[in-house]
Amino acid sequence: ALLLIVLIVGGIRGGVFTPTEASVVAVFYAIVTSAFVYRGFTLADLWGAFLRSAIMSVAVLMILAAARAFAWVLIIEGVPQMADAVIAMDLSPIAFLLMVNLLLLVFGMFMDPLPGVMILVPILAPFATARIARDHFAIIVIVNLTFGLMTPPVGGLIFVVPRDPAEPSALIREQPPFFLAAMASLLILTFVPALSTWLPQISFAR
């Protein structure tokens, strides 16, 4: 099983396959290993896994469809103009980062990360990269929008993780301590840029 990690990371780093293709390779490797090495995986188990994956995929796609529709409403109502207003304030770097965090957190509550990146990053990036490192800004955007996956009203992960349809509400009730810890980590990432920039600097150093 540990070879799966080596296979995925090595294949991506070596340019053998893309991250999307790596997921297919991982599934194939897991099926072959379970069936022929551990000998605990039957055709009935495979069909059950496919069925559970299909049900989960349908649930996620329905959430994404609703989120995209709501994203269109937000765009029509002027959310991009809110980003322009933040830029027009001419804030200090610290105040700007706090405003960007707030904007992205609210935006991420109603939309999945990809549309959020496509809509807000082109507006904020030119101003942000003039004040902070590009890697730092990218991490802040990704972390903020990812938090939206576990916060109502959309919260895609809230509906993906539970197996029982009644569990999302119970999951939401258990969230506050973890969400506070996530907010603390976000503030640390925001005000300690080295945590966001050291790995890219090492990885791409010549």
Swiss-Prot record:
Cell location: Cell inner membrane
InterPro entries in the record: DctM, TRAP_DctM
Entry's Gene Ontology cellular component terms: plasma membrane
Membrane-topology descriptor: Multi-pass membrane protein
One example GO MF annotation: transmembrane transporter activity
Keywords: Cell inner membrane, Cell membrane, Membrane, Transmembrane, Transmembrane helix, Transport
Transmembrane segment boundaries: 24-44, 55-75, 91-111, 113-133, 139-159, 178-198
Keyword Cell membrane: yes
Entry keyword annotation includes Transport: yes
PANTHER family: C4-DICARBOXYLATE TRAP TRANSPORTER LARGE PERMEASE PROTEIN DCTM, SIALIC ACID TRAP TRANSPORTER PERMEASE PROTEIN SIAT-RELATED
Family to which the UniProt record says this protein belongs: Belongs to the YiaN/YgiK family.
Protein name: Putative dicarboxylate transporter subunit
Organism: Paracoccus pantotrophus
Organism classification: Bacteria, Pseudomonadati, Pseudomonadota, Alphaproteobacteria, Rhodobacterales
